[in-house]
């Protein structure tokens, strides 16, 4: 265990939308420290979403992120020699982090040609409440629902 809780690091807002959430998303999208490439992928994807849906691209992205973020998850807790999957509520910062991670990972595994297309496709489908990332969220919720009996083993 660490001695003290680490100080929270605050991110600078992104240049185009001046939103710290976008910066966080781009940071998880980035490979090998190539932030400018990650920014161009994200901005192009948002523009593509705007073109396809004729709504604000950033709003569609935020809606998609809310649809993908889990409310509850299961955590392993060892009680007397057996391990239980205990459903717990997800903290707001972790909720967003998981949503971003899932959105990016499932966008990467899509079939389109470029990452911009993949990300735009996943954002659009997630905002409609479908797609692989939303399915992952539902699986996590289903797992928590199935293990509701162990919710008295709080952390």
From Swiss-Prot:
GO cellular component: small ribosomal subunit
Residues spanning the membrane: none
Name of the protein this chain belongs to: Small ribosomal subunit protein uS7
This protein's record includes keyword rRNA-binding: yes
Assigned keywords, A-Z: Ribonucleoprotein, Ribosomal protein, RNA-binding, rRNA-binding, tRNA-binding
A GO molecular-function annotation: rRNA binding
Quaternary structure annotation from Swiss-Prot or TrEMBL: Part of the 30S ribosomal subunit. Contacts proteins S9 and S11.
Species, as recorded: Cytophaga hutchinsonii (strain ATCC 33406 / DSM 1761 / CIP 103989 / NBRC 15051 / NCIMB 9469 / D465)
Gene3D superfamilies attached to this UniProt entry: Ribosomal protein S7 domain (1.10.455.10)
GO BP term (any one): translation
Family: Belongs to the universal ribosomal protein uS7 family.
Known function: One of the primary rRNA binding proteins, it binds directly to 16S rRNA where it nucleates assembly of the head domain of the 30S subunit. Is located at the subunit interface close to the decoding center, probably blocks exit of the E-site tRNA.
One Pfam family here: Ribosomal_S7
InterPro entries per record: Ribosomal_uS7 (IPR000235), Ribosomal_uS7_bac/org-type (IPR005717), Ribosomal_uS7_CS (IPR020606), Ribosomal_uS7_dom (IPR023798), Ribosomal_uS7_dom_sf (IPR036823)
